[in-house]
Amino acid sequence: VRAPKETSHIQASTLPMNSLTARLSLDLLGLNKDQVLAVTGGPGAYGGFVIQLAKADGLTVIADSNESDRDLLESLGVDIIIPRGEGFAERVREEFPNGVDGIADGALLNESAIEAVKDGGSFTSVRGFKGESQRDIDFTATWVTAYDCKKAILETLCQQAEEGVLTLRVADSVTMQNAAEAHTKLEAGGTRGRMVIEF
């Protein structure tokens, strides 16, 4: 698959893994236009793509955020922003008393986010759900390898990047000799976009 037009190699390298993971999450959730999706970890690379793809799919999106990330989430298209911190599920229920139709759990909140989902809703996590199944919620794990060799999906994502539906966010790039610096930054948390190692 060719890189999106008018992008650098560094920018283009941020597309495949996280956008495919985000697309898979939404496909696993199986939500329909006008349904409501909650996203945890929205400011991150995965969460940002989930938000933008969900909006392109016609979903209403609610996400939690620190005040410092509020402008970013607004630029990604989030409809409702709630404060990050304890009580995620309760804050979601304040906005949607019956619960949301699905959650893409990029921040790995696991059981602390379940109460935000309505009975019979959907929950997917990037590392697999840790907790007890309940209330007929459909729990899935988003493993990007499920979309290995799915050329048509990646081509669509490329086109969406070209059209501005998806934003290719580079947090920073480092040379191969400074790869440890990238790992140090990732371990510190708070990365917005992808760290890229240049070869």
Regions found by a protein language model. Name each.
Residues V1-F199:
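Terminal helix/beta-alpha structural elements that buttress the NAD(P)+-binding lobe
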